[in-house]
């Protein structure tokens, strides 16, 4: 089907229902009131304000401003105008005057930024109203990105549907009582815009035509890519699309051991590539760190290829570019962000392509704090550099519906080379993975996400978010200091500590004079939100607990609010005598209707986006203080966690919150769980790759496997990707042997098996390892590949 050209709507979009007009006027001025009446008669809501004091960041739904500059208000009007433009809004602004003349107007500060002047009495209110309404409508049109705008226009045409989906505008639902509830809850628009590709007005989402491809082109321009592809089933699919477009069976892939399971599945199981694993850091709080800096060394990487048992041709280690693809988590779940420029200097010449998995970021292209940390903003990419992919989970911290993802492709600098993957071949991989029945509102959310980041607006949105994150960390640091001095004993001298430096030094900054050993919370917010040195993981610093870094190599993400719970000494990384496992606090917060993103051993993660405001963050702080008060009086567990207690009444009868934390902390300490977790991602613990991951998965499909208790898996080949979720990072990979090197991995899972039995109600999700209840206890089982007596795989 050939789509029609992108067209203007045949039915006017009802901007009068979507935007309002704000009038900052003297309510006693009859001519001004007549102007307002004329605008209201044209269907627009008009909000009257008496002055210019409102926070313009809350005015995203304003279609035009009318502002009086009489009566000494000219200076305030100028400040207001600057505030609107500074946050990136291009909202029409009309200056309303009566006695001021042309010579009174400041051409530089005023006339250059306003859309027009209203002189009451010179033209009729009806005429001025038409001008203002017209400017609001035109502004509304300018806000509509290609696909979303086309979808609104299509909806306005009220086409009669005899195609998919079967609910046909929601009318099927309205035929039944349950369906009526469903229809009314979501509202008619979502159903009317759940469209079918049988009508080509909106273009083809799979072969990229019409408004669909225009939306993706606009996103590419805004994010800095050569091409962008919208993906509607998550970054798990985006990663598989890239992996299967680039990799063949037997290709070498440089593989971050922190990679999400989707890259194991796409690159290793589906494509059949051979991984060269990169060791990664964990700190004692259970947080995910970066690849060891030393692991990027070319000599180390070539040696690993030579030593790999699945690489039969050892000369591959000598190839100019031995790696077809590198797969790297640009930002870890816990907020470690790589300096992309530094990593590219180390491995760029060794790889045909680099895939940067940006599932947990995506805003790094829009704020100067992240300079050097965005692959789409790298400069001077030459023909000797690798092609770049970024995969982004727009739904995680962007403005996208759940499962909204996108792939950015930046490789025109290698166009014409044999390693180049042109669009047509790339799209064949995309077609293998995406649905032929896309959900149009989901696609539109990706279109709008790009639009809201266009121009200055993207930076301003994230600037405010970063600022709020800084302020809440400063507030929390104040509580830390308070309780350290006011607590009656060590078990009360604590509070939830934000994961930022205690003290920092800054030198040669464009944003600050030199600082020496200054408390982080004492540094001005305007400096903190601009200066990378305030967020870097210094190699020698103790506060972060990571090892193996280089100067400037990584920084902490300001939009990941991570709070540490007691139990670990930040200076030494060793267990303390008492502790509060983060899972207890996470369960408490959920009881209080505050939902954290995740928890690990002794850390809580809260995602920050431009959606945040003071009310949410102050409520979070209040709930944390409430938990501290419950802790200090050692409240009954039934009061702190009523749901967990009710489900496990017999187990926790008579328990207080301190008692359950004491037992759980002692268990984790005695089992050495933090050290087991760290070892799972170190080179010395990587098991023997007995067979390729793809071969192990084929054994699982063919049922050439045994289902055994994990304690009996020693020496056997794993047939599954085993992991704890979150964060969904593979601990042992299909094809790896549960050998002696893998003992930390086995002991890590067995520690969780025991914790599930000891502490019901505080379980984590496990995948690739399965929970069976035997004789009243949970026991972990897993699938292992069936081998013949001579070590060959059964067929």
What are the language-model segments listed below?
Residues 28-35, 74, 100-106, 262-263:
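Short, charged/polar "capping" segments at the starts of alpha-helices
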Residues 2-19, 40-43, 53-65, 75-78, ...:
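Non-catalytic terminal extensions of PLP-dependent enzymes
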Residues 19-22, 228, 253, 326:
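Conserved hydrophobic helix-helix packing surfaces used for dimerization/oligomerization
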Residues 60-66, 114-118, 226, 251, ...:
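Conserved acidic residues
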Residues 177-270, 276:
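Long, structured ligand/cofactor-binding scaffold of large enzymes
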Residues 9-30, 35-40, 44-48, 268:
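Conserved acidic segment of CheY-like receiver
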Residues 47-52, 57, 78-90, 105-107, ...:
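Conserved PLP-enzyme active-site core in the AAT-like
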Residues 23-30, 50-51, 66-71, 96-100, ...:
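Structural motif
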């Amino acid at each position: 089907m050939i789509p029609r050209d992108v067209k203007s709507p045949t039915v006017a979009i009802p901007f009068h229902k979507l935007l309002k007009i704000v009038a900052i006027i003297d309510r006693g001025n009859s001519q001004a009131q007549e102007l307002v009446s004329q605008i209201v008669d044209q269907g627009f809501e008009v909000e009257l304000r008496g002055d210019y004091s409102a926070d313009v960041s809350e005015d995203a739904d304003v279609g035009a401003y009318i502002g009086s500059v009489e009566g000494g208000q000219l200076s305030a009007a100028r400040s207001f105008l600057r505030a609107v433009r500074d946050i990136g809004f291009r909202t029409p602004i009309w200056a309303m005057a009566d006695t001021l003349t042309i010579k009174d107007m400041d051409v530089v500060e005023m006339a250059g930024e306003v859309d027009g002047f209203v002189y009451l009495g010179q033209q009729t209110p009806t005429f001025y109203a038409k001008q203002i309404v017209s400017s609001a409508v035109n502004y509304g049109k300018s806000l509509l990105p290609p696909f979303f705008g086309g979808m609104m226009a299509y909806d306005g045409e009220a086409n009669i549907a005899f195609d998919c989906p079967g609910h046909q505008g929601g009318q099927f639902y309205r035929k039944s009582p349950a369906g009526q509830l469903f229809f009314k809850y979501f509202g008619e628009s979502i159903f009317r815009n759940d469209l079918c590709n049988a009508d080509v007005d909106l273009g083809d989402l799979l072969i990229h035509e019409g408004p669909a491809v225009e939306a993706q082109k606009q996103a590419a321009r805004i994010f800095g890519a050569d091409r962008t592809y919208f993906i509607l089933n998550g970054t798990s699919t985006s990663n598989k699309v890239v992996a299967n477009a680039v990799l063949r069976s037997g290709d070498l892939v440089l593989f971050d051991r922190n990679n999400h399971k989707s890259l194991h599945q796409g690159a290793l199981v589906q494509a059949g590539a051979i991984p060269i694993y990169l060791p990664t850091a964990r700190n004692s709080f259970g947080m995910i760190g970066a690849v060891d800096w030393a692991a990027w060394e070319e000599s180390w990487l070539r040696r690993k290829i030579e030593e790999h048992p699945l690489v039969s041709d050892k000369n591959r280690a000598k190839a100019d570019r031995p790696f077809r693809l590198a797969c790297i988590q640009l930002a870890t779940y816990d907020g470690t962000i790589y300096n992309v420029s530094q990593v590219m200097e180390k491995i760029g010449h060794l790889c045909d392509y680099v895939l940067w998995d940006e599932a947990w970021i995506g805003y790094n292209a829009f704020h100067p704090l992240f300079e050097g940390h965005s692959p789409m903003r790298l400069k001077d990419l030459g023909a000797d550099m690798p092609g770049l992919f970024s995969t982004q989970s727009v739904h995680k911290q962007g403005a996208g519906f759940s499962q909204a993802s996108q792939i950015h492709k930046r490789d025109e600098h290698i166009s014409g080379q044999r390693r180049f993957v042109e669009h047509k071949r790339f799209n064949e991989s995309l077609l293998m993975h995406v649905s032929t029945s896309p959900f149009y509102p989901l696609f539109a959310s990706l279109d709008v996400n790009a639009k809201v980041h266009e121009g200055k607006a993207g930076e301003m949105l994230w600037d405010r978010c970063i600022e709020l994150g800084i302020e809440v960390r400063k507030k929390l640091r104040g509580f830390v200091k308070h309780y350290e001095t006011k607590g009656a004993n060590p078990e009360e001298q604590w509070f939830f500590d934000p994961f930022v430096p205690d003290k920092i030094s800054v030198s040669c900054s464009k944003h600050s004079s030199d600082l020496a050993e200054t408390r982080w919370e004492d540094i001005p917010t305007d400096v903190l939100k601009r200066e990378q040195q305030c967020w870097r993981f210094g190699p020698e610093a103790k506060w972060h607990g990571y090892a193996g870094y280089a100067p400037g190599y990584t920084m902490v993400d300001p939009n990941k609010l991570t709070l540490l719970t007691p139990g670990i000494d930040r200076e030494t990384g060793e267990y303390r005598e008492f502790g509060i496992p983060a899972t207890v606090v996470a369960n408490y917060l959920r009881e209080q209707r505050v939902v954290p993103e995740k928890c690990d051993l002794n850390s809580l993660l809260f995602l920050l986006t431009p959606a945040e405001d003071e009310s949410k963050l102050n409520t979070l702080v209040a709930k944390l203080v409430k938990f501290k008060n419950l802790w200090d009086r050692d409240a009954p567990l039934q009061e702190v966690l009523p749901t967990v207690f009710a489900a496990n009444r017999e187990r926790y009868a008579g328990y207080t919150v301190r008692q359950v934390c004491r037992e759980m902390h002692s268990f984790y300490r005695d089992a050495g769980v933090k050290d087991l977790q760290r070892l799972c991602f170190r080179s010395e613990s990587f098991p023997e790759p007995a067979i390729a991951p793809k071969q192990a998965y084929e054994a699982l499909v063919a049922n050439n496997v045994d289902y055994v208790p994990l304690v009996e898996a020693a020496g056997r080949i794993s047939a599954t990707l085993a992991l704890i979720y979150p964060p969904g990072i593979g601990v042992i990979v299909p094809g790896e042997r549960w050998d002696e090197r893998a003992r930390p991995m086995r002991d890590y899972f067995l520690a969780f098996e025991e914790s599930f039995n000891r502490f019901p109600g505080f379980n984590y999700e496990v995948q690739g390892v399965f929970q069976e209840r035997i004789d009243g206890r949970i026991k972990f089982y897993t699938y292992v590949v069936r081998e013949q007596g001579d070590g060959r795989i059964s067929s």
